[in-house]
């Protein structure tokens, strides 16, 4: 199924599931309109999607913001793969807790807001990639920890933006756990710390870990 939006964007207030056990693919092709999904994706009984693709076209006007609630649960994937955003996407907001696919995940935007409490992004031995279109950051909400887990196999973790916490509020530093199993971790930001701003514990697990700049903790 492919949905194409224009300047008006698209908003989904309910859950989105595949026909049971059919793993139907879903593409939402937004231009300058925002896309918002406030219900969970792929959490119905045998309702996981196939490929989930949202706003990936690299068109000049494709700048709409994207907001997503959960994809899957902590024990069941909500999609076979996840590809969201492009280099011109304004802000990509992940407001849920679980983002689980069996296959690879690619997230791209000028800025990322992770507003859910203790977000977990996980795959089954497949890559997780965060790309930024400009000088964006992945900003965690106050007291919200981030875990990215690609399973015990060779799923790589590659992150171009800085991962940053939020000062103020309850003012508990945010913890970061990146576990690539037997895969590799690359934190690619240059010119500023790869992880910084009100960050507590940082745990990195992988065969090879490449840091292109500093890590700063509180």
Task: Describe these PLM feature segments.
Residues 1-218:
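Extracellular lectin-like interaction modules
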């Amino acid at each position: 199924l492919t949905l194409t939006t224009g300047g008006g964007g698209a908003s989904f207030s309910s859950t989105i599931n595949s026909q049971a056990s059919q793993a139907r693919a879903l593409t939402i092709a937004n231009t300058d309109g925002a896309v918002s999904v406030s219900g969970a994706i792929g959490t119905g009984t045998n309702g996981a999607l196939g490929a989930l693709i949202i706003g990936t076209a690299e068109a000049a006007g494709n700048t709409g913001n994207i907001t997503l609630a959960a994809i899957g649960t902590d024990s069941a994937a909500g999609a076979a793969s996840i590809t969201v955003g492009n280099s011109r996407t304004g802000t990509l907001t992940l407001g849920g807790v679980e983002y689980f696919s069996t296959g690879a995940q690619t997230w791209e935007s000028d800025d990322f807001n992770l507003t859910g409490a203790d977000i977990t992004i996980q795959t089954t031995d497949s890559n997780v990639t965060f790309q930024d279109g400009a000088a964006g950051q992945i900003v965690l909400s106050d007291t919200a920890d981030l875990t990215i887990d690609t399973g015990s196999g060779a799923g790589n973790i590659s992150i171009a933006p800085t991962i940053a916490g939020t000062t103020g509020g309850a003012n508990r530093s945010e913890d970061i756990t990146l576990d690539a199993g037997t895969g590799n971790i690359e934190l690619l930001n240059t010119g500023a710390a790869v992880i910084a701003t009100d960050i507590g514990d940082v745990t990195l697990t992988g065969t090879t870990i490449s840091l292109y700049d500093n890590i700063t903790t509180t």
